[in-house]
């Protein structure tokens, strides 16, 4: 039996191979019989096309037969099916693999496209996004450096610019695609933390010297129904869950501006340091949008980082009828926006954007082998300089294809 390691070892030979194995039917033979036959390469295009055709057929069959969004199966009922699987022994061919997948996954998958599905914020997806997903998986670009992505870098940057223009963040804005709202919120609060800490006396900065003694006094203010990713972010940032101070909401489930003002005053009186205020544009449970303008003005008057979690409601930037609900976002220092929610994109597709691109320096590290500082000075657009990730999928392609084909 050949393994993944065997495939990697023979990659060089496979790239130039024209073996007969590569021309045979992809789902009627075993890929384990020849590591060369399993590699995506020019020699295996017939096999790739055959496999993609079969997978497309399977998806169509599944969607045509789905009667409800979810079967309701429990973990206890499904887990035994995995108990005796031997991952060291591959199945005989693609058809066998797909049959197994139907039983283990597709039969009980959650079908978000179904008109009766309303349980979560996951959305049905548009065709351009699905087509792009197939393309980006095949080409497999990594968006960390220019020399690995070229045009992909510029596509992503143009989409970031489009997003910040729609949000009204101004000409100094910038950002980066992320895996989702949780990562975007983490990144935004990291930037807020480091922006506050670099202003402290006798502290040379978090990146080189770690957190200052004052870090235990940093606080984040958000409504009592804001997303739990804020607590997770504060834990990861060394501040702890309790660094998030919940602010009361009004009868419309929006952050109460007066309650925020009181909370900020009380924190100052107790010697605490307001690090950031997070306004939610679309709460998970109610879809409520905090009074962004009032909160933004409060933050600006006090010199506090203003973050808008628009993971859910950010899609309103495309709405002529309802876009006014996001008025005030233009005052934000950072914004989270999930394209894989109200933009109908396949998971994952999200972004964290900032009003002042220089704040992105807090996530920058120059590695000589990858993104040396000289390249940055010369203007090479290495996206890793403003990302928490290094290797990163070309998820921006999904939104790009959608805008180019649908508008």
Predicted segments, located by residue:
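N-terminal entrance/gating region of PLP-dependent enzymes' catalytic architecture
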Residues: 2-4, 8-12, 23-172
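Glycine- and acidic
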Residues: 35-41, 83, 139-147, 169-176, ...
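General structural feature for long, well-ordered alpha-helical segments within catalytic domains
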Residues: 48-51, 55, 59, 93, ...
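Well-ordered mid-protein domain cores that form the structural environment of catalytic cofactors
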Residues: 124-215, 223, 229-230
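Active-site C-terminal subdomain of aminotransferase-like
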Residues: 328-407
């Amino acid at each position: 039996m050949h393994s993944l390691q065997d495939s990697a070892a023979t990659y060089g030979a496979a790239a130039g191979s024209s073996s007969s194995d590569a021309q045979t039917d992809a789902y009627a033979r075993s890929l384990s019989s020849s590591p060369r036959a399993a590699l995506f390469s020019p020699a295996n295009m017939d096999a790739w096309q055959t496999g993609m055709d079969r997978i497309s057929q399977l998806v169509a069959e599944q969607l045509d037969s789905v009667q409800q969004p979810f079967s309701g199966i429990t973990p206890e009922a499904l887990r035994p099916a995995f108990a005796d699987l031997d991952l060291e022994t591959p199945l005989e061919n693609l058809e066998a693999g797909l049959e197994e997948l139907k039983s283990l996954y597709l039969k009980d998958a959650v079908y978000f496209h179904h008109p009766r599905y309303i349980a979560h914020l996951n959305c049905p997806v548009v065709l351009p996004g699905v087509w792009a997903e197939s393309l980006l998986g095949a080409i497999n670009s990594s968006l960390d450096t220019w020399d690995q992505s070229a045009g992909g870098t510029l596509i992503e940057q143009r989409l970031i610019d489009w997003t910040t223009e729609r949000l009204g963040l101004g000409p100094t804005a910038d950002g980066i695609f992320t895996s989702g709202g949780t990562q975007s919120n983490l990144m935004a609060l990291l930037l807020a933390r480091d922006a506050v800490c670099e202003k402290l006396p006798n502290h040379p900065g978090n990146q080189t010297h770690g957190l200052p003694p004052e870090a235990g006094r940093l606080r984040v203010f958000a409504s009592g129904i804001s997303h739990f990713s804020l607590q997770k972010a504060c834990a990861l940032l060394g501040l702890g869950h309790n660094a998030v101070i919940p602010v009361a909401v009004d009868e419309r489930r929006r952050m109460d501006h007066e309650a925020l003002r009181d909370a900020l005053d009380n924190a100052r009186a107790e010697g605490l340091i307001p690090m950031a205020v997070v306004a939610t544009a679309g709460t998970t449970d109610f879809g409520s949008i905090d009074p962004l303008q009032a909160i933004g003005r409060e933050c600006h008057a006090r010199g506090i980082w203003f973050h808008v979690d628009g993971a859910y409601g950010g899609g309103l930037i495309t709405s002529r009828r309802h876009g006014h609900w996001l008025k005030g976002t233009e005052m934000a220092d950072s914004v989270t926006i999930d394209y894989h929610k109200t933009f109908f994109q396949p998971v994952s597709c999200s972004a964290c954007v900032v009003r002042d691109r220089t704040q992105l320096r807090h996530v920058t590290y120059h590695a000589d082998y990858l993104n040396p500082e000289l390249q940055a000075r010369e203007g090479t657009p290495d996206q890793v300089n403003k990302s928490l990730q290094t290797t990163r999928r070309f998820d921006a392609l999904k939104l790009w294809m959608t805008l180019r084909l649908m508008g």
